[in-house]
């Protein structure tokens, strides 16, 4: 599989600087290295509108919001602290103070309702996390009063990490049924963390089976099989993607040793508000344009399944890391959304990912948590 350069056709120029427009016009389309299988990413329908508001570019925030829970109070608490990221760079202290005040008010008045969202057997752990959040909020309040930017960033991160752990305790059941036609494929019924060691350094990847159980399950299964160990990065484009997972020999993906057949993985995209993922077609083909996705390409280090451009269900072992600089991307302007299955994010190791280029190697990959969430298919 390779990545080729193609023009993107017509783009909305609203609010774009010329330098950004030039960069977008040289974006790349993912295709397999087979003659005649290339289809440019040139449909203007994908590019004709910009989502309003601030796009979330923090992978940890995206993962928190993707948890399948229904507790408005904890979401309100999270929202207040997430919003600080929109103000901290410019040091808008009144807005930051308002966010912290709202967070303190929520945890003071709604603690019981937050705790009620956690199963009884997990509540002792939840109470500990709530205590940690309160401590962080006290320190955060003091840091805001002192206008100490670094301390604000530190205590906000600590509080949000605890909130994410608290929200994870609220998840009880897997949120949807996976279609029977994919029952033979590995499925990740939850989340897993993968530590990938490359010759340039380590990467920590959180893989989200709540939003993309088949794509995530396939990746975790191949990691468990040590399939990726020693494989090279076969293509890398600055400010766009770094791709790996192509096995040696003529095959373009994983051949199941039991069936001796190519393991084909479907396109799998979860739109927020839907009961389950859309399978087997791009969102454009499904008549959906720029919807809000559970796992968007907003974040640097999004990991997605590579596939033939004309075959939504033709992916297998090859994947790519999305490296486009989010600071150059208008809010919600994600050209890849709805065309490829995102199944996780790099949450640590951005510096490593920035250095990876064609010819570098995956030394090893291992699952360090969540392996028990992997359910092997029938083959």
UniProtKB/Swiss-Prot annotation:
Its Enzyme Commission number(s) read 5.2.1.8
Q: Where is the PPIase cyclophilin-type domain?
A: 190-378
Main localisation, per the record?
Answer: other
Reactions this protein catalyses:
[protein]-peptidylproline (omega=180) = [protein]-peptidylproline (omega=0)
What InterPro entries does this protein's entry cite? Answer: Cyclophilin-like_dom_sf (IPR029000), Cyclophilin-type_PPIase_dom (IPR002130), CYP38_PsbQ-like (IPR048563), E_coli_cyclophilin_A-like (IPR044665), PsbQ-like_dom_sf (IPR023222)
Which Pfam families does the UniProt record give? CYP38_PsbQ-like, Pro_isomerase
Q: Which SUPFAM superfamilies match?
A: Cyclophilin-like, Oxygen-evolving enhancer protein 3
Spell out the disulfide connections: none
The record's keywords, sorted A to Z, are: Isomerase, Rotamase, Signal, Thylakoid
Q: What does this protein do?
A: PPIases accelerate the folding of proteins. It catalyzes the cis-trans isomerization of proline imidic peptide bonds in oligopeptides. Required for the assembly and stabilization of PSII.
UniProt-recorded name of the protein:
Putative thylakoid lumen peptidyl-prolyl cis-trans isomerase sll0408
Native species: Synechocystis sp. (strain ATCC 27184 / PCC 6803 / Kazusa)
């Amino acid at each position: 599989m390779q990545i080729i350069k193609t023009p993107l056709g017509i783009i909305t120029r609203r609010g774009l600087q010329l330098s950004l427009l030039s960069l977008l016009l040289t974006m790349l389309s993912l295709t397999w290295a087979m003659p005649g299988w290339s289809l440019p990413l040139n449909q203007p329908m994908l590019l004709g509108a910009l989502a309003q508001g601030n796009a979330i570019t923090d992978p940890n925030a995206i993962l928190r919001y993707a948890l399948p829970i229904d507790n408005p109070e904890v979401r309100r608490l999270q929202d207040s602290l997430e919003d600080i990221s929109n103000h901290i760079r410019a040091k808008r202290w009144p807005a930051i103070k308002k966010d912290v005040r709202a967070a303190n008010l929520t945890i003071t008045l709604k603690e019981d309702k937050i705790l009620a969202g956690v199963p009884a057997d997990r509540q002792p752990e939840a109470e500990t996390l709530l205590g940690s959040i309160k401590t962080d909020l006290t320190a955060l309040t003091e840091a805001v009063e002192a206008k100490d930017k670094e301390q604000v960033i530190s205590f906000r991160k600590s509080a949000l990490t605890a909130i994410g752990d608290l929200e994870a305790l609220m998840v009880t059941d897997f949120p949807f049924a996976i279609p029977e036609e994919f029952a033979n494929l590995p499925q990740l019924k939850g989340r897993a963390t993968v530590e990938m060691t490359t010759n340039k350094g380590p990467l920590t990847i959180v893989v989200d089976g709540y939003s993309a159980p088949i794509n995530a399950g396939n990746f975790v299964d191949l990691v468990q099989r040590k399939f990726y160990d020693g494989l090279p990065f076969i293509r890398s484009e600055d400010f766009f993607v770094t791709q790996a997972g192509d096995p040696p020999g003529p095959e373009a993906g994983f051949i199941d040793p039991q069936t001796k057949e190519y393991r084909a993985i479907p396109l799998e995209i979860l739109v927020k508000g839907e009961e389950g993922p859309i399978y087997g077609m791009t969102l454009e083909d499904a008549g959906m344009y720029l919807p809000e996705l559970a796992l968007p390409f907003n974040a640097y280090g999004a990991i997605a399944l590579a596939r033939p451009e004309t075959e939504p269900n033709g992916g297998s072992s090859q994947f790519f890391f999305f490296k486009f600089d989010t600071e150059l991307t208008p809010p919600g302007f994600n050209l890849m959304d709805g065309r490829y299955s995102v199944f996780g994010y790099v949450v640590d190791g951005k510096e490593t990912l920035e250095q990876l280029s064609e010819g570098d190697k995956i030394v090893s990959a291992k699952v360090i948590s969540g392996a028990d969430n992997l359910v092997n298919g029938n083959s």
